[in-house]
Amino acid sequence: MAHATPQGVKLLNGWKRPGRFDKGLGAQLPEAYRKFWREWKLTTPAAVHYIPKEQQWERDEVTHAIKPVQNIPLPLIDTPESHRGIWGGEAVIKGFQKREQTKRRVPHFWVPNLRRSVVHSHVLDCYMSVVVTERTLEQIHECHGFDHYLLKNRACDLRSALALKLKREVLQALQNGVPALADEPERQQEVLKEYRRYLEPYTPEEIDWYGHTYLEAIRKLQKQLREAEKVVPHKLEFRGKLIEQLRQAGISEAGKLEKPDALAAESSVEHKDSDIEALTKLESSPSSSWLSKINPFGKKET
């Protein structure tokens, strides 16, 4: 079969479409970020907008026919506003609604009920005013605190970029020993004892890359690459080479000749004579032919 295809063995299992991690800067992203991305985008979240059925078969109420159960999640729309709040896994649903029996169905958007509330983080030691839903408040109460809610739930269940950013900050604070409570050692130890167990599934690199969007991860990678490969301007490079050649020839730099007025008056003549002699020796050497062209004291070739 492989000889029948022009590409050989490569197309036996079909053509794989390149993804965001297969080309460009996305291919250079570390495995720590890819693990977070799989948890955020490729993991099936908990059912929020429908009740999943546990049985494999069910009987139709009208036709009484037996049919298999298909727990297909609803397609959700993550709006920019959803990433600026904490919606508890909820999102906007687009569908159709038949409002009257004798009229056609019309498009409709179902939006969760939003409200602004204040949440408190023990690890960060701060209060935050965020837009939440009733489900978010219920889950915070079930988890016995906002920090537990962030650390217990996976990225696919938190869903919003704000919640993931706060979770990364909480993990980094726990990793650094809760610096926000440095003035209260007893309370600091209590918080560390209560939340330290959430650090076990993560490595320091995974915590550093956790909660970033794809664009933020690319910008962070570009910043690391620029810092690792700093380009030295040619001006500084050539200046360093010139100073090194002058130093080998015995000529001191102009900045180092600056002395007090009393000493400068005595040694000015000596420095001029020594510099002229050194430049003359430097001109005679074959490696300094280019320097003789810019030396105003050098002899002109006839």
Curated annotation (Swiss-Prot):
InterPro entries: Ribosomal_bL28 (IPR026569), Ribosomal_bL28/bL31-like_sf (IPR034704). The keyword Mitochondrion applies. It comes from the Eukaryota. Keywords: Mitochondrion, Ribonucleoprotein, Ribosomal protein, Transit peptide. The keyword Nucleotide-binding does not apply. Its main location: mitochondrion. It is found in: Mitochondrion. GO terms for molecular function: structural constituent of ribosome. Disulfide bonds: none annotated. SUPFAM superfamilies: L28p-like. One of its GO terms (cellular component) is mitochondrial large ribosomal subunit. One of its GO terms (biological process) is mitochondrial translation. Component of the mitochondrial ribosome large subunit (39S) which comprises a 16S rRNA and about 50 distinct proteins. Belongs to the bacterial ribosomal protein bL28 family. This is Large ribosomal subunit protein bL28m.
